[in-house]
Regions:
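An anion/pyrophosphate-binding glycine-rich loop and adjacent beta-alpha core
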Residues: 351-355, 360-461
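A conserved FAD-binding loop/helix module that cradles the flavin
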Residues: 327-352, 501, 540-572
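Helical element adjacent to the flavin cofactor pocket in flavoenzyme catalytic cores
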Residues: 254-311, 351, 357
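Conserved N-terminal/central alpha/beta ligand/cofactor-binding core
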Residues: 157, 166-276, 280-282, 395, ...
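A glycine-rich dinucleotide-binding beta-alpha-beta segment and adjacent secondary-structure elements
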Residues: 285, 465-547
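Glycine-rich loop(s) and the adjacent beta-strand/alpha-helix scaffold that form part
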Residues: 300-302, 308-372, 563
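N-terminal Rossmann-like FAD-binding beta1-loop-alpha1 element of flavoenzymes
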Residues: 130-160, 569
Length: 572
């Protein structure tokens, strides 16, 4: 990509003297290793100041990296210092930008030690700002943005508070998989399905611990939610498949990598309806009046906000997988040693705020591990044409099993890890997250070999065991049955080249949270509605029970986010 971001200043910046010579005037380019590939910058200086910084080339993940690519150059130019904060959630990209700019300034003869010193400017006192709107939404992930758009569609004025420097939450980092029964399209692809089947698998897959009425709302409205997204130009692939832990092929895969398509569609819709989004603004407290939630206090970079809601507040700030203290409170063995796939903002802030106003919690002890970690990279996150083998080269589990059962089995294997084995039939140029397979191979994340003998040697497993595992799987494909009880079958693993990706479990989804009713109103400990208070998305509990099916999280965010926004807008 060329000239993605450019930042410049006019005249001398604060704290610099026009006569003080600091650099050799000119334009300088430099590179640094980014998250996905080298990142290239151009820095222009005059004798005394940094004038302009351009990001010339990068292959960073859209949405997740945008704030780092934009805000760090801007901050360096404005403050004339390299001592700027990295962007939470995009640390690798942030550091790459800083390193590249540092190298360019070295070329310009800059005193790097001096440039790394913090500005001596006194901290600016934050201004107290009071605002009023119809609906306040806390969190700009899939649920929050869905709520904001749905409320705005009803004519409500909406303000969204997002503590991170970018929208997206966990949605933008997801695999983009959306479960919805679409009988007509599924039947055309030879798939028999029904809403009843989706309900049964979701409810029983959650060990019958979910609230049946909420499960019913999810499965009955997921297709409508998908069509709603499509009305804002969201694109899905034609083929319906299944992802790990989905139990059935009803997964609609987003055409854009990861969750980028969802957030692009919702941002477009929010802009259309003039939704106000305040980034880098953390909600800190719910404002109460006679038992009703009437607003939110929040802290931004420059302002302290007190925002009043004429109608309601929707809490959609996500789960708590990135909060080690909170998750170990409910599941002690999920310590800091257990990595998470979640973004760093998933710290349960909204749950804490909700508790303080009397909200009831449900299912906090149900925390799901994802069996597909290592940043979700690899040729695929689908299971239709994959087998899992341990470090002895043996299959050990039904790959289309529930995620909790998969993780239980994986953690019993050597090092708590396994290899996902694929052949050439399902390896595209990029996977569901937009990663180029060639780049993943170059990084060593994915191992590639022309035959199984070479693949076994590449990953250090016994050749005879790997070949036997693949051979037995291929026979099972013909019979549509195997000893592990697998139910999803597609093609054999027989056409080279072959691929192996090392994976392990990581904390992925917190099923517990604020207790809600069918209208997404938050309930107190006596089961009564807390007036003016709604919630949607991973911050809520009671939908997925003790285990969430793969592909059910995104419809959860869209369906319940939309319901919350509509009902909040209808408040008198």
């Amino acid at each position: 990509m060329l000239l993605i971001f450019s930042f410049s200043i006019l005249g001398c910046s604060k704290g610099t003297s026009g006569s003080e010579k600091k650099f050799k005037a000119g334009k300088y380019t430099a590179e640094a290793k980014g998250h996905n590939a080298p990142l290239k910058v151009e820095v222009e200086v005059d004798d005394s100041s940094i004038k302009e910084i351009k990001i010339l080339e990068h292959k960073e993940t859209p949405g997740i990296s945008d704030a780092a690519l934009k805000d760090i150059p801007k901050g360096i130019v404005e403050a004339q210092t390299l001592a700027v904060d990295t962007i939470s959630g995009a640390t690798i990209t942030s550091n790459a930008v800083i390193v590249a700019i540092t190298e360019a300034l070295k070329q310009a003869g800059g005193n790097i030690d001096e440039l790394k010193k913090k500005s001596k400017d006194e901290d600016v006192k934050k201004e107290q700002v009071t605002k009023e709107t119809d609906v306040i939404v806390v969190g700009a992930g899939g649920a929050g943005m869905s709520a904001a758009v749905a409320a705005a569609e009803k004519g409500a004025k909406v303000i969204v508070l997002e503590k991170m420097p970018m929208i997206g939450g966990n949605t933008i980092r997801s695999g983009g998989a959306y479960n919805a029964v679409d009988v007509e399209r599924q039947k055309a692809q030879g798939i028999e399905d029904s809403i009843d089947k989706h309900y049964t698998q979701t409810y029983e897959g959650g060990d019958k611990k979910g609230e049946s009425k909420l499960v019913k709302i999810l499965v009955e409205n997921s297709l409508e939610g998908k069509k709603w997204l499509e009305s804002y130009d969201m694109k899905f692939n034609d083929k319906i498949g299944s992802v790990v832990g989905s139990l059935w092929p009803r997964t609609h895969q987003a055409s854009d990598p990861a969750g980028i398509g969802y957030m692009n569609a919702l941002k477009k819709a929010a802009d259309k309806h003039k939704v106000e989004i305040l980034l880098n603004t953390k909600a800190t407290e719910l404002i109460m009046n006679n038992g009703k939630v009437v607003g939110v206090k929040a802290e931004g970079e420059k302002n302290l906000y007190e925002i009043k809601s004429k109608k309601a507040v929707v809490m959609a700030s996500g789960g708590f997988a990135a909060n080690v203290e909170m998750r170990t409170k409910y599941v002690p063995n999920l310590t800091k040693d257990m990595k998470t796939t979640n973004h760093p903002g998933a710290t349960g802030d909204g749950i804490v705020m909700g508790e303080k106003v009397g909200a009831d919690l449900v299912g906090m002890e149900y925390i799901q591990l994802l069996p597909m970690a290592i940043e979700l990279t690899g040729p695929t996150i689908n299971v239709e044409n994959s087998i899992f083998i341990n470090k002895e080269g043996n299959r050990f589990i039904n790959e289309d099993n529930r995620r909790d059962k998969l993780c239980e089995a994986i953690l019993k294997q050597k090092d708590g890890q396994y290899y996902m084995i694929n052949d050439s039939q399902i390896v595209k140029e990029t996977n569901e997250l937009g990663d180029k397979i060639s780049e993943l191979i170059e990084k060593g994340v994915v191992k590639k070999a022309d035959n199984l003998d070479e693949l076994a040697k590449a990953i250090g497993v016994p050749v005879e065991n790997l070949k036997k595992s693949v051979e037995e799987f291929n026979k099972a494909v013909d019979k549509k049955s195997d000893a592990f009880g697998r139910g999803v079958w597609k093609n054999k693993i027989e056409k080279g080249p072959f691929y192996a990706t090392l994976r392990y479990p990581a904390v992925h989804h917190t099923m517990g949270g604020l207790k809600i009713n069918e209208k997404t109103q938050v309930l107190d400990k006596s089961g009564k509605v807390i007036p003016g208070f709604y919630a949607a998305g991973e911050i809520t509990g009671g939908i997925h029970g003790g285990n969430r099916l793969g592909g059910n999280a995104l419809p959860d965010t869209i369906v319940f986010g939309k319901i919350a926004g509509e009902n909040a807008a209808n408040e008198k």
